[in-house]
Amino acid sequence: MMITLFTLAVVSIGFFLWWLLTVQPAVTKRALKHIPELRFEDNDTPERYTQDSRSLLFRGYDKYLRHGIPFQMRHPIEELGPQVLLPMKYLDEVKYASTSLFSFPLFSEKVFLLNYSNAPRQTDAAAHVVRVDLTKNLGALANGMYQEAIEGLNQSLSASEEWNTLPAYDFLSSLTAQVTALALVGPELCRNREWIDISLQTTFAIFNAAFTIRSQYSPRWRWLARWQSDAPKRMRAMRARAVELLAPVYQDRLAAIKEHDFGAFADCLHWSLRGNGGETSLTRIAEQQLFLTVASMHTTSSTLTAVLFDLLIRPEYCAEITKEMQEALTECEGKWTLQEVAKMRKLDSFMKESQRVHPIGFITAQRMTVRPHTFKDGLHLPAGVIFQFPADAVHHDPAIYPRPDQFAGYRFLHLRETVDANRYHFASVSDTMLGFGAGSHACPGRFFTSLAIKLILVVLLTQYEVKLADCDGSRPANGFNDFNMGPSREATIMIRKRSGL
């Protein structure tokens, strides 16, 4: 009898914890009644928040945030409740706060239903290997990444000087996957088509799984999705295949570590194992690699595509920056170091201005409150609230950036020359440049992203002629979804080898 009662108690407690973590209702408007709400004046539907949230954010910034007042707005995913936009005065309290108070992983779980989809998760180990090992070794990786960009273009394009017409985003995503995979998993897999396909598909699989599960199961019954829904099954299959592809590479890295040959390989897989004394399992390594792919792949390729579009419609900038690249190439004799990359200051400034005008997201520092919190000035947020800061609106504030709607490719070069030579570079973060987040939780891979984009652009612009296909001189229109923006997925480019090369 005692065993039965004990078992029943354990099951009951377990069910309550499951309910608390997965079925607990989202925070209500009533709990946020002290925060003003902003809505669309007409057609205030969830779809409108998916398609037109930028205009509402700008309205909210001018009406509330600029004056230090937070506001709430509808979340396009109704079950998540209202979301809060905070003014910048709260950023310092948030950006250094512990994840036990304000959590991005919890936000990701609630939005993408990671508990049900078998998707790879963020881990401290993965963030550490990028922040420390990868960043520290970028100089050693630079030339290999440059050569990989050359190889990737040679594989994709005809050797003749005929024009190749290609879908810009898909082409650049595949090239980015190959170049970045060299640093993530090493030379054995960076040219493996199946690994590249997994790299490209994982992010979309996560989005699709969340959408499918949310549409098929109410919160109370989502635990069934792991066994019934095809979406988690597809994710499991991708993870299993990733493990199979990584297995021989994993064994090679493990053998090198056991022989104390710590310099044998320069990639994140090796550094992850070395940091744990070779005791990290293959399954866990695969989890880390898939997460790093999700974190870096489409953000890097989207930014690269946006920068290229901005260059191609501004031939005066394109010519000057290509000349700067050629001078750097001559000086380094085709063997890149970080010092030589850093000399391309016009390119760096142009990339940062492109990111300011055409970001991949309108907001930054997305978090969910793990427990109730009262800020220093008395603002209270209950547990379970999604909140964020208005990056895009800050980047278009004329009090911060004069003539913010004008694309000034050398805006940040001028600031480096007149204000501070050590600030305003592409990978830097500040309270007025939020493209990579803020504080201790800023994107740990931003220096890697910067290097990859620059080296790919060097190969594209110095060895090839590139132009937009069917272009009337205007930039291909961006796509919008919720708080996200990205370069056109339909736009095509024309590319051919420069004569004499």
UniProtKB/Swiss-Prot annotation:
One GO molecular-function entry: monooxygenase activity
Signal peptide as annotated in the record: 1-28
Recorded metabolic or biological pathway in which this protein acts: Mycotoxin biosynthesis
Lineage, opening ranks: Eukaryota, Fungi, Dikarya, Ascomycota, Pezizomycotina
Binding-site residues for heme, renumbered to this chain: 443
Enzyme class: oxidoreductase
Species whose genome carries this gene: Aspergillus clavatus (strain ATCC 1007 / CBS 513.65 / DSM 816 / NCTC 3887 / NRRL 1 / QM 1276 / 107)
PANTHER family in UniProt: CYTOCHROME P450
Gene symbol of the encoding locus: ccsG
Annotated glycosylation sites: 115, 154
One GO-annotated biological process of the protein: secondary metabolic process
Coiled-coil features, chain-numbered ranges: none
Pfam families assigned: p450
Family: Belongs to the cytochrome P450 family.
EC number: 1.-.-.-
Job description of the protein: Cytochrome P450 monooxygenase; part of the gene cluster that mediates the biosynthesis of a family of the mycotoxins cytochalasins E and K. The hybrid PKS-NRPS synthetase ccsA and the enoyl reductase ccsC are responsible for fusion of phenylalanine with an octaketide backbone and subsequent release of the stable tetramic acid precursor. The polyketide synthase module (PKS) of the PKS-NRPS ccsA is responsible for the synthesis of the octaketide backbone. The downstream nonribosomal peptide synthetase (NRPS) amidates the carboxyl end of the octaketide with a phenylalanine.
Statement: the UniProt record of this protein carries the keyword Cell membrane: no
Named cofactor requirement(s): heme
Top-rank taxon: Eukaryota
Protein name per Swiss-Prot or TrEMBL: Cytochrome P450 monooxygenase ccsG
Keywords: Glycoprotein, Heme, Iron, Metal-binding, Monooxygenase, Oxidoreductase, Signal
